Amino acid sequence: MKILTGSRGDEVHEHLYENGQRRVGHRILKKNTVTNNGEFHPVPGNIVLIPLKGTVKLTTPDQECTIKNGQLAILGSTDSFYLTAIDDVEFVGVVDIK
């Protein structure tokens, strides 16, 4: 068993765990932050995004969705995306790297 604890701060982008093709990332974004300057970023593999706090808008070339604590989003390895923090937001991403 591993217990993982992420960093604290206004802007955090870190990998909490990486083993083979599995990566667990942790992000904290301030309200109104848009990742990658609103440009689509290729997905490194299948991703499950799990908000811990706040609301985040996930934008792909084909759709937009807003997710919050208690929900999750699944992106396929062929997707590209960027995120917009609707509130101050904290989330975890679990990636199966291609």
Where do the language-model regions lie?
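Short, conserved beta-strand element in jelly-roll/cupin
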Residues: 41-57
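A short, N-terminal "cap"/entry segment at the start of jelly-roll beta-barrel domains
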Residues: 1-28, 36-39
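Short, charged/polar surface micro-motifs in flexible loops or helix N-caps
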Residues: 21-22, 30-35, 53-55, 97-98
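Short strand-coil-strand connectors
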Residues: 20, 59-63, 86
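Short acidic-glycine-tyrosine-enriched beta hairpin
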Residues: 61-78
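Ligand-binding loop in jelly-roll beta-barrel domains
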Residues: 77-98
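Short hydrophobic beta-strand segments that form the core of ligand-binding sensory/regulatory domains
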Residues: 27, 47, 92-94
